[in-house]
């Protein structure tokens, strides 16, 4: 037999309204609260969370929408967000979009229907461009990827500057023909491309960039295609960790050596990058700090809904390893 709130009230010797106030942290004396909590424990009653949401008009849940949790960047980000939510006695619901705008729209609609408290979100470029015109009952903080200037709170790194650091380092090592491979779904990749292009122009070098699916297989296939066509650049740069993995797989598959035959650099200081060969040169992003800062900004937005939108930019760090060594004579 199911236990109802009336059963709890009867055992505690209070009214159902008092039990409800205990569940919603309403004004109840300590003595009555203890009686209700004891009755809940004795009966094994579990509050109806959906009903509580209807009464309070919001949940105690944070939505986290990312492209793919298998991307180590988002794995680390998710843990930081969940830890911050736990400390605030809140839950996190995780959604993977697979870079699909239709799937994004479905999850955003779900968040609205579930009266979510707020959302941490890494949107595709297509959705980010229209976010400012959308009307939500909850605040959104973007991570890693930006929307239209000033339309949303955002936390990330200076992507253009970080890409420029990689180019400057490669040029200092004597590399001139530097290929840049960038994802085709996010504003982050566009910003990194722009930083790459600006740095190449600053050094008087021609750009050679490609936009493709932000995945390991796509990056590997693109490198193999270029090598089959007789194009072997001095160096190749990937705009995210999954693409960097694909590039390294392609280099190994082609029987090439880094950095003797080709230099390889990219983004995200994942654990495997220091274990392969002489190690891969990367931009390290403060991912956990990004997650914590996003949650801090979301809580601030909840406390002060009318505050001006903020853009929090953290610094990426160049980690130099053997894969970007001096170009062979």
Identify the role of each PLM range.
Residues 42, 83-88, 136-142, 146-329:
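Bacterial carbohydrate/catabolite-sensing allosteric modules
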Residues 105-161:
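Short beta-strand-centered segments that line the small-molecule binding cleft or hinge
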């Amino acid at each position: 037999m199911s236990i109802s709130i009336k059963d709890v009230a009867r055992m505690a010797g209070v009214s159902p309204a008092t039990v409800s106030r205990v569940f919603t942290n309403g004004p109840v004396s300590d003595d009555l609260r203890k009686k209700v909590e004891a009755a809940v424990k004795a009966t094994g009653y579990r509050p109806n969370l959906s009903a509580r949401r209807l009464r309070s008009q919001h949940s105690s849940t944070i939505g986290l929408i990312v492209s793919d949790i298998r991307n180590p960047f988002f794995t680390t980000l998710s843990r930081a967000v969940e830890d911050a939510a736990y400390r605030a006695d809140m839950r996190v619901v995780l959604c993977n979009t697979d870079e699909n705008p239709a799937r994004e729209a479905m999850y955003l609609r779900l968040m609205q229907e579930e009266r979510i408290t707020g959302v941490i979100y890494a949107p595709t470029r297509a959705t980010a461009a229209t976010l400012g015109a959308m009307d939500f009952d909850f605040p959104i903080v973007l991570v890693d990827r930006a929307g239209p200037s000033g339309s949303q709170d955002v936390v990330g790194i200076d992507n253009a500057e970080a890409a420029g650091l990689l180019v400057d380092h490669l040029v200092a090592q004597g590399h001139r023909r530097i290929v840049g491979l960038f994802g085709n779904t996010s504003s982050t990749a566009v910003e990194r491309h722009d930083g790459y292009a600006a740095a190449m122009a600053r050094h008087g070098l021609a750009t050679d960039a490609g936009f493709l699916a932000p995945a390991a297989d796509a990056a590997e296939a693109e490198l193999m295609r270029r090598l089959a066509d007789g194009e072997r650049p001095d160096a190749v740069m990937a705009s995210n960790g999954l693409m960097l993995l694909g590039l390294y797989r392609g280099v190994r598959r082609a029987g090439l050596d880094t950095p003797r035959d080709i230099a390889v650099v990219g983004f995200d200081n994942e654990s495997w990058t220091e274990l392969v060969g002489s190690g891969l040169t990367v931009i390290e992003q403060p991912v956990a700090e990004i997650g914590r800062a996003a949650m801090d900004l979301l809580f601030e937005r909840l406390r002060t809904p009318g505050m001006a939108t903020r853009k929090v930019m953290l610094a990426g760090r160049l980690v130099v390893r053997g894969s970007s060594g001096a170009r062979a004579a």
